[in-house]
């Protein structure tokens, strides 16, 4: 099966030629087949978020190619890639417009892909569609379509952001530590919704997480990043036998550095 997402020798450096020069990504290669759910772990500065931003088009790579479904999108702008990619950020405030209603937020997200105006997005047929999708969240938001998004809790906003990023079934879903800012109960809810939505729509998903156990529990593949490189990969079969302890051992074996806890490799 051909790759739905393919990264070829991605290299990105920031502040080149200055004392603050930093290689964020060091010739990264990555292939994901349709339906793959890859979890990504790594320390602060490992290059995880830069990787996400290069895939989404927010940042342009210095060297290398980004291919989506066989098309070279390396230099295609972020707003043009939005038809192919859904993304949920760590900050619950980042995915929604706080002064707009739930309904208006959903209509805008829908129009990005369907290239229709806001008015058509608010038709009765579209409103019924939004209600149907909101019911999946089990948060009662289908009865609060006229509520401002800014009045929702962090967990509710993140659940809404997840729905907005996925209900048009993008080719690729990017989840950038999307539960990290939530309290444990809401993080558990959003994680459960993530698994449900990804499985239902068979979405090709790349998820960065600060939580090793979450990385082990979700997805069919796992990669570990450090200093701009992918230093460890586990396919579905290998991933089933992994534990946090084994991941820490792998890091120590590869880098020659001992990690004292699961958090130390992630923060």
PLM regions: where:
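H-loop/switch region of ABC-family ATPase nucleotide-binding domains
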Residues: 209-210
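The feature captures the beta-strand-to-loop junction immediately N-terminal to the Walker
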Residues: 41-43
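A short, flexible loop at the N-terminus of ABC-type nucleotide-binding domains that lies
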Residues: 3-4, 13-27, 77
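ABC ATPase C-loop
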Residues: 165-166
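Conserved ABC transporter NBD signature motif
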Residues: 64-72, 232-234
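ABC ATPase NBD coupling module
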Residues: 72-86, 94, 116-119, 123, ...
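Helix-to-loop junction immediately C-terminal to a conserved catalytic motif
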Residues: 56
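Conserved beta-strand-loop-alpha-helix hinge in the C-terminal portion
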Residues: 229-253
């Amino acid at each position: 099966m051909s790759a739905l997402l393919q990264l070829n020798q991605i290299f990105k450096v920031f502040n080149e030629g200055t004392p603050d020069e930093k290689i964020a990504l060091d010739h990264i290669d990555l292939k994901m087949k349709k339906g793959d759910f890859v979890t990504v772990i790594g320390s602060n500065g490992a290059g995880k978020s830069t990787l996400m931003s290069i895939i989404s088009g927010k940042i342009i790579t210095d060297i290398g190619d980004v291919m989506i479904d066989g098309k070279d999108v390396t230099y295609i702008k972020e707003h043009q890639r939005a038809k192919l990619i859904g993304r949920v950020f760590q900050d619950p405030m980042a995915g929604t417009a706080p002064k707009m209603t739930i309904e208006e937020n959903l209509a805008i997200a829908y129009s990005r892909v369907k290239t229709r105006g806001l008015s058509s997005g608010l038709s009765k047929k579209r409103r019924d569609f939004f209600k149907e999708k909101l019911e999946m969240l089990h948060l009662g938001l289908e009865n609060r379509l006229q509520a401002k998004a800014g009045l929702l809790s962090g967990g509710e906003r993140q659940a809404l952001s997840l729905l907005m990023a996925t209900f048009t079934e993008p080719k690729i879903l990017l989840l950038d530590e999307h539960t990290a800012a939530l309290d444990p109960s809401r993080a558990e809810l959003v994680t459960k919704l993530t698994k449900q939505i990804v499985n239902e729509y068979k979405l090709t998903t790349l998820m960065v997480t600060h939580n090793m156990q979450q990385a082990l529990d979700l997805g069919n593949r796992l990669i570990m990043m450090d200093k701009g490189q992918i230093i460890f990969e586990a396919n579905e079969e290998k991933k089933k036998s992994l534990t946090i302890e084994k991941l820490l051992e792998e890091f120590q074996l590869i880098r020659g550095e001992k990690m004292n806890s699961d958090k130390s490799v992630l923060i």
